[in-house]
Amino acid sequence: MDTKADRYEGIDGLKAYAIIGIALMHVLANGEYGIGGFVFERLIPSFTNLVFLFMMVSGFGMCCGYYQKIVNQKISVEDFYKKRYIKIWPYFALLCALDFVISPSKESLFEVFANLTLCQGLLPNAKISVIGVSWTLAVIFVFYMLFPFFCFLIGNKKRAWGVAVAALVFNWLCSNYFNDGRTNIVYDAVYFIAGGLIFLYRKELAEFVSKYKVIAGVILLVVSVTYFAAGSSTFTMLSFCVAALIYTLGCRTGGGVLVNPVAKFLGGISFEIYLCHMVIYRVLEKLHLVHLFGNGLLAYIFTAVAVICGSVVFSVCAKWFLNKIETFLKEKVNNRRVNHV
């Protein structure tokens, strides 16, 4: 993994704000609240595209942790994929089981099986409803499968730029010819490649942002405004994600909006929150709490806060529970080995 000196603390804050935005968007979209204005008609709905930011951060983060190990053959194929499954599968399996209990059906059982393999991202147009937001996980796991090939693609800067251009063209073809959207790894590849490119230039970019943080902030503001002025497109979203990730590289000192204990905590469990927040929403829905205060702003705020807080509590408790089980199983295996010696 990257060393302490190479750790980019601001990324946790970036992930924290991204997951809050996505949760706000899903609550608004599913609750069908009768509220209007720019914030509720354009700003919050646009947060759906923050999933692409997660993909870019995944590309960058995986490179920080494993690029040199893969290139220098310091990690075996078995160890690499084992770590991916061990990190994701237990928590995701628990969520799938809960989702099935909440809404049991034959179709859900089929989808749970697909989810538990973590290979659902290989299915064409799967449209899985069990943990529906996990399509992002499905795409990211396909990226994990292809990561050794990805390391080859960004093996040098010249090749990486060529691959980035090809990925951008492929993204356009997916939209305009092949009719494949964001649930397809080929469509999303440009975001992972962009994360890899930023990794290749990470030292220069971090130094630039540290020296000229105001300029980097202005660039981020400009691309954010452009996103709304020019409309949502791969180019505008890609520009925003790149500017946001680059800006965070220079945020290493505490006290800011990106580097603080709360942001670090939420960023550390951001993907767990992402996967569970709609399960929490469905529970609130079944308890008839989504419209407890009517259909207006107060009801939306209450539901959004309840979903976010509930997701945080669930994520922390679930991780604690799964860690206890893991520790118990390891101790049991170790005791058996001792007894056999």
Report the location of each language-model feature:
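Signature aromatic-anchored transmembrane alpha helix within multi-pass, membrane-resident enzymes
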Residues: 165, 211-224
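A cytosolic-side transmembrane-helix exit/cap motif
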Residues: 129-136, 184, 207-209, 255-265
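Short, aromatic-rich membrane-interface segments at the entry and exit
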Residues: 110-111, 158-163, 181-188, 231-240
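Membrane-cytosol interface segments of multi-pass membrane proteins
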Residues: 1-173, 269, 291-341
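Membrane-interface helix caps and helix-loop-helix hairpins in membrane proteins
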Residues: 105-107, 126-131, 174-183, 225-235
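Juxtamembrane membrane-interface segments at transmembrane alpha-helix termini
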Residues: 54, 71-72, 124-125, 173-180, ...
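Specific aromatic-rich, kink-prone transmembrane helix
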Residues: 58-61, 145, 193-200, 244-249
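Alpha-helical transmembrane segments of multi-pass integral membrane proteins
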Residues: 101, 192, 221-324
